[in-house]
């Protein structure tokens, strides 16, 4: 830090001032680098580095105290995997400068309050954990920490608040105990027993209706799928029974015990959990993912049991590493494989399990799906001799458990596995999965293999996929993705509209205009009625069929050719698809043409929605139509539906944002007018108020359309599921068919993937669709969803 003390020779005042500013910035950057990098690989020991850094920071406190405070609060929040390193550093600084220690504690409490107010509950957990570990470093007095935890657990006694609020405060308390439980029990055992008793009482009366919706597997063998608070409570109970002996947390402060025990401690200021408000959004509950146990790696170090607190600590630290470095896959992979204490645990098994736990987390993974694919690829490159084998073992386990796996997680498994294979020349021992060849094609295993090969084809080409799998798998291979043109062979001569199709083909090739196409279509007879209207464009399925079939056939060369065709003849599409029936029929014909090319179907539907040829409700009705019944359980169908819902949601959000911006602009103009007597602003206000009124109408119309879309989707789900249940009851057969599992879990998927939007329409859904008279099997899904934020 000697840069600050350099003397500068200069003749003028201004250059000297500029150099001082530059020098201060350099020093601040250097401090940031030192603080962020402490604990990384170094020639010196961690203890030596911490002692040296504490000395540097102490020397810089007079000039850079606020910067140092801010940096330490930030790393406490953003680098939780290095928690004990930073608590030790704060402990050393507190021992040297008591006032700084007090200011740091106050700053942390302020930051905790801000995080809770801003609904940053994940960061708030790390701040609470950091504060609790400061007890071990003799910065915070144990009784005041116990008092804070008493206030946390008192939230369980609150009335008329969501369960997820109570859950968070209990979790914040329990998840800190692996670090500080021993110290708190030694100092305040009676108070801690009282807190434990309150916690246990709460956990026993908690509702767990939400659990089935969040489980990766419906079966508890070989590993139970436990609710996260139940699992953590069992781990803490075992830790308490073992006299708080924990062997995995890095505790560098133990090396400085003689220094830290002499330091004066601070009492936490009284902390009252902020009250629940309408704007409070708490973390959703989770189910703990388990894939491995000690039997899966008999030769290596023993994997801690599921109720061992070491399992919690290891998983928590690995999750924290991913959270800190997920945007840099190479750095993230390097940090994971260099995890401290890696020789004491089967690290590769833990890493793979944690990554799949995040990928399969419901309702959504913490990060985008493709990040996990790229991270696993990097890990395979870093550990080529060991990690690919563990990953292959995990893949085999997932395949074996497909029968009870959530459909949403199966989708993610398909997407991950196909993408992963594409990076390794699609090599896989397919013969090991030949058991799927003897099963019904709708069963989970053959269905999974079929969908994987379909996705692989998107990342390669059809013939290559045929070449990489054994001939015995041919029934599961995707069809050749070619266009099916019904007017293309001699046998089609007798088909209605054949002659018009020939005329259209010539016209398209001759670069005909929209008007010329209208002229050709004008005389196409309408099979639905004797007399057409004057314009000749009332819903006419034959017109749509001839036009769409011929145009898509001629534009079949590529995606861009098809897009150009839609754009050029947009006016014809809009006219033919003017009615709801017309929109539905356009989708049906497009599907007939591209039945063997799911990717083309998906991109064409996407384009038709964007260009307003069809609307979102038409797509939903088409997906539930009889024409798609054979493909109803195919993955591409549900990708289209979710994409459609997302488009609708984005459309509503876009208009809402425009409305908010207009209102803010008007408020600014009002403020300016009150500050400055400007009469011309009256005219501006009038124009803006008109714009706000128009936007308000657009928002209401868009929300009505959005609500209608969800009503259509849920109504169709209820209809087809009810038909299935009634049919099974009439026939005396089991309802638990592969189709039923897929369908009921697709219903769950809609709720989960769009939960934030659907929450707005809960009352409408409950009053109109999910009523008490509904079959309990279907109603249970709605009740599980309601329980997620209850």
Curated annotation (Swiss-Prot):
Residues found modified as Phosphoserine? 7, 22, 201
Coiled-coil zones: 643-713
Q: Name one GO molecular function term.
A: RNA 7-methylguanosine cap binding
| Alphabetical UniProt keywords | Acetylation, Coiled coil, Cytoplasm, Isopeptide bond, mRNA capping, mRNA processing, mRNA splicing, mRNA transport, Nonsense-mediated mRNA decay, Nucleus, Phosphoprotein, RNA-mediated gene silencing, Translation regulation, Transport, Ubl conjugation
Q: Give the position(s) of the covalent cross-link described as Glycyl lysine isopeptide (Lys-Gly) (interchain with G-Cter in SUMO2).
A: 684
> Where do the TM regions start and end?
none
Please report, in chain numbering, the residue ranges of the motif Nuclear localization signal: 3-20
What tissues has this protein been observed in? Answer: Expressed in the spermatogonia, spermatocytes and granular cells within the cerebellum.
Q: Where is the MIF4G domain?
A: 28-240
Q: Which GO terms describe its biological process?
A: 7-methylguanosine mRNA capping; alternative mRNA splicing, via spliceosome; cap-dependent translational initiation; defense response to virus; histone mRNA metabolic process; miRNA-mediated post-transcriptional gene silencing; mRNA 3'-end processing; mRNA export from nucleus
Summarize subunit and interaction data from the UniProt record for this chain: Component of the nuclear cap-binding complex (CBC), a heterodimer composed of NCBP1/CBP80 and NCBP2/CBP20 that interacts with m7GpppG-capped RNA. Found in a U snRNA export complex containing PHAX/RNUXA, NCBP1/CBP80, NCBP2/CBP20, RAN, XPO1 and m7G-capped RNA. Identified in a IGF2BP1-dependent mRNP granule complex containing untranslated mRNAs. Interacts with PHAX/RNUXA, SRRT/ARS2, EIF4G2, IGF2BP1, HNRNPF, HNRNPH1, KIAA0427/CTIF, PARN, DROSHA, UPF1 and ALYREF/THOC4. May interact with EIF4G1; the interaction is however controversial.
Provide the function of this protein.
Component of the cap-binding complex (CBC), which binds cotranscriptionally to the 5'-cap of pre-mRNAs and is involved in various processes such as pre-mRNA splicing, translation regulation, nonsense-mediated mRNA decay, RNA-mediated gene silencing (RNAi) by microRNAs (miRNAs) and mRNA export. The CBC complex is involved in mRNA export from the nucleus via its interaction with ALYREF/THOC4/ALY, leading to the recruitment of the mRNA export machinery to the 5'-end of mRNA and to mRNA export in a 5' to 3' direction through the nuclear pore.
Q: What is this protein called?
A: Nuclear cap-binding protein subunit 1
Q: Organism, per UniProt?
A: Mus musculus
The lineage, from the top, is: Eukaryota, Metazoa, Chordata, Craniata, Vertebrata
What is the gene called? Ncbp1
